[in-house]
């Protein structure tokens, strides 16, 4: 029988774009300490993945944004943890970013710069996928 500890953990994140820049946070704690990732975290009971993505964006970066379509569902399986992460798209957020208590840093980075960073799993792939959303001229096609 599978124990509760062996079940996947549902999480949500948001790929926030501003032209040729992407918002990344440097993780301030495990898992992935020191790696650069999208703002995100575990989904709380009774919360949708979209609500969790918005909450995590506010907690980790101090900003808000209109969350758009889901880019995809990504899995990260490490030695002792299995995450299923719903990743959403957002662009042109409101506010000035400021790293929250569980982020070591938060910043806008040019897409061409992120390859030199220690990235969390799937980040480069999701950034590449997000490019297609930037070419859509009508925001209502991308944002709900």
Question: What is the meaning of each model-derived region?
Answer:
Residues 9-11, 17, 38, 65, ...:
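Short connector loops at helix/strand junctions that flank enzyme active sites
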Residues 19-21, 28, 91-96, 111-113:
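Short loop segments at secondary-structure junctions
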Residues 33-36, 101-144:
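Nudix hydrolase/Nudix homology domain
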Residues 38-70, 88:
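The catalytic Nudix box helix
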Residues 21, 29, 43, 75:
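Short, glycine/serine-rich, charged loops/turns that create anion-binding
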């Amino acid at each position: 029988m599978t124990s509760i500890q062996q079940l996947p953990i549902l999480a949500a994140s948001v790929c926030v774009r501003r032209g040729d820049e992407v918002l990344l946070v440097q993780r301030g704690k495990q898992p992935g300490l020191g790696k650069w990732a999208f703002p995100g975290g575990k989904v709380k009971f009774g919360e949708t993945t979209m609500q969790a993505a918005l909450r995590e964006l506010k907690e980790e970066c101090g900003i808000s944004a209109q969350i758009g379509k889901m880019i995809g569902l990504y899995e990260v399986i490490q030695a002792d943890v299995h995450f299923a992460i719903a990743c959403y798209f957002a662009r042109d957020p409101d506010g000035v970013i400021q790293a929250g208590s569980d982020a070591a840093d938060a910043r806008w980075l040019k897409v061409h710069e992120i390859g030199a960073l220690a990235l969390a799993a799937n980040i480069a792939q999701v950034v590449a996928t997000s490019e297609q959303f930037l070419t859509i001229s009508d925001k209502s096609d991308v944002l709900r």
